[in-house]
Amino acid sequence: MSRVLVPCHVKSTVALQVGDMRTSQGRPGVLVVDVTFPNIAPFELQEIMFKNYYTAFLSIRVRQQSSMHTAAKWVTCLRDYCLMPDPHSEEGAQDYVSLFKHQMLCDMNRVLELRLILRQPSPLWLSFTVEELQIYQQGPKSPSLAFPKWLSHPVSNEQPAPRLEGLPDPSRVSSEVQQMWALTEMIRASHTSTRIGRFDVDGCYDLNLLSYT
């Protein structure tokens, strides 16, 4: 199925502090990133792609247009998705990630805005985020191709092939050729190997006595 890149605006991250920032123990453990789609009508989200940068867990909330008469609501569509199996090691820290709509907890129709919530509980990393964020929506369906009738309805092997006008029946021709071949073999087998003697009549040859085989 085709997909189309959706133009988006990624706002600056907002850090939620953990601990007292006036001490060395205080550091941001949660980041919030809002993604808006200016001048884009509500759309069906197909895929989210990004490059991780030391984010251990990802949650996503989506603001959807429910109807024309009610206000849009925020819904959690992904909760604590693991990007780093061990937050204290490098595994998965800088991987490219693709998330599809079938992985979400809700329908991804009529999307107006996204909110990414990034968590990194390990104190080993000075910073974390997501990079190269791309949002895709479902593209137009490909038009169906019309196949020729002879491709759509192939002739069965059990059906006899149509005869061509003016040509003999192939099976009859084959039978006659087989009979002619058998007759030729019989004549060849009965042909004598004795040489025909000379016929001398009054010192000359009579051509009428020559045998043609």
Swiss-Prot record:
Its main location: nucleus. GO terms for cellular component: cytosol; microtubule; nucleoplasm. It is found in: Nucleus. Keywords: Microtubule, Nucleus. Coiled coil: none annotated. High expression level is found in brain, testis, liver and kidney. Weak expression in spleen, leukocytes, small intestin and colon. InterPro entries: Nicolin-1. Part of the neuronal tubulin polyglutamylase complex which contains TPGS1, TPGS2, TTLL1, LRRC49 and NICN1. This is Nicolin-1.
